[in-house]
Amino acid sequence: MKKIASVLALFVALLFGLLACSKGTSSKSSSDKLKVVTTNSILADITKNIAGDKIELHSIVPVGQDPHEYEPLPEDVKKTSQADLIFYNGINLETGGNAWFTKLVKNANKVENKDYFAASDGVEVIYLEGQNQAGKEDPHAWLNLENGIIYAKNIAKQLIAKDPKNKDFYEKNLAAYTEKLSKLDQEAKQAFNNIPAEKKMIVTSEGCFKYFSKAYGVPSAYIWEINTEVEGTPEQIKTLLEKLRQTKVPSLFVESSVDERPMKTVSKDSNIPIFAKIFTDSIAKEGEEGDSYYSMMKWNLEKIAEGLNK
């Protein structure tokens, strides 16, 4: 009996040893690539253009949804906890409103500037109208392509720090990508220079085009200022209509991630048509126009220039 017991004990020990080895091998295999999490589809696309297949990438806020206020899913919590590197926009986008990102990284025991980084670091911040204090920043810095280039450089820097063996790969992709963005930026500046001053105003639902306005010399007007406040009230619509009566703006625009009904009301009451949907807080679904940061910006720039030249 002792002999049988000894054999059984040896068998069990060997079995657990094999399982442990198998688990270890599987774990190592799955962790060969850097695990990266981004808060939204725009950051995910910029990251993908630099990192390619060298990383495992998870984006939290789904395409077409508003990143200002979001409730992370269990899968988001799991991926964030497992992440080697996390990129968020910053400038009060994910940390304003219901502060969903602040709670997420705290619960995942992640440390700022060690595990998670603001892609917007180094951007010249623009504030909401009449404000100039922390918590009142306009977060939509990526709508200026020069800032998109800053995002890309920040993302590449942290990828290289975490994964130095792929440094050359990341740097090569960064150079090609930023050159592409820079070329589009220059084309846009030229296009907007040729629009008559009396027509040059971009009118949107959310007042998210301040960075765009500064970069391309196109003043902006809006129904509400930021998506974390009340949206599309009669008073907000009335204020915009009064402003439009003093202009010769030929076209209105509505963002892909907001309720279009308030802008339809503005269009009806002002007799100014909605020319196109444009992208702000999200890229488009895969396979559609605007399904990358570059293509969404190209779409925006072309549609806005075309609409204002009517």
Swiss-Prot record:
- A single GO CC term, please? plasma membrane
The entry's keywords? Cell membrane, Lipoprotein, Manganese, Membrane, Metal-binding, Palmitate, Signal, Transport
Where does this polypeptide localize?
Cell membrane
Q: Where is the signal peptide?
A: 1-20
Q: Which PROSITE patterns match?
A: PROKAR_LIPOPROTEIN
Q: Which family does it belong to?
A: Belongs to the bacterial solute-binding protein 9 family. Lipoprotein receptor antigen (Lrai) subfamily.
Q: What is this protein called?
A: Manganese ABC transporter substrate-binding lipoprotein PsaA
Which gene name does the record give? psaA
